[in-house]
């Protein structure tokens, strides 16, 4: 059990997991240089050259497992050709697969052409400082990775509605995110004589303003355009018509996509979600302070500052205060025409020859963002199959991974190491 909890020292819990890794991967621990930083791991495999270091990464920590499960959430049961348990899909599958890949290569006496780093943080799920500690150590050593490969994209079933089959979705752009705490104040009072423009009424008007006149601009990033263009030939006729002719239909799609699909709309603009609210403690008491939390996911063409400023302008109309909490901007996109991206695409084609490869825009967050300062090609791709059941179970009930996914994942990481020369 490696559930991470914010602001708690849980190093001992993760050291227990590390002892299991020592038993499972003895050659890795014998031949690679291991560094442990507060439960976070770095394994260094010296290659013949240090010119193009490769980082394979995945987090050890998982979210809590609540509710009634078909199998105990930390049992690791293997049944019905599935590995059951919290973390099986998110993302111990990646950690175990790249460790197994290196274990096999060591057994064969293989020496990598380039340096290899296997890294794993223990605070990803709580947005902690585990990965920054790893990156800080790599910076201290002067390591500048050629490619970083983290979670994010995967082998996805039906990536957008109507496009059937499986696709290797390679994450190349990660949206930023942040929270804005909106506060409305008053003198409070009794609910029997409510004034106009009470705190909750002002918050309601504020939300209504955003919903009716959204300040967030929809537009196609070049990575989003590449994603839809790549998937177009595999969709029904209307997809091939619209997405195969984006230059012609882009103005129309910018308007209709957010209305048709929230998922597609999130690829085109900064999104605003209302997640938490508070008022008074009494049913008949007007609050002296009411709050509303907005969770934003920032798109490059309207980044963190511009998006937050747009919200501030609307908030000022209703005499509301705005506090930024944990905001960070979008990640610099990976150049899909770069040699690094081409190398990953080549490996996917070699290991999974029947899978179309497609760039992917990520609306969620990963640890890979911390590597931006030392690497230009932070790829988000887990080489396992994620269908609807995996997507539903990752932070929910009955998380599992199909066992048939694992040999391909190991082969992918083996090939990533071998082809990096």
Question: Which residue stretches match the model-derived regions?
Answer:
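Acidic/His- and Gly-rich active-site-bordering loop/insert found
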Residues: 2-86, 107-114
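A common structural junction motif
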Residues: 60-61, 210-215, 312-320
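Short, solvent-exposed loop/turn segments at the edges of secondary structure
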Residues: 71, 113, 143-144, 165, ...
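Acidic/histidine-rich catalytic neighborhood of metal-dependent amide-processing enzymes
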Residues: 83, 89-169
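A short core secondary-structure module
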Residues: 131-137, 192-216
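Hydrophobic beta-strand positions in extracellular immunoglobulin-like domains
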Residues: 184, 296-298
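Short amphipathic alpha-helices in soluble, non-transmembrane regions
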Residues: 197, 307-315
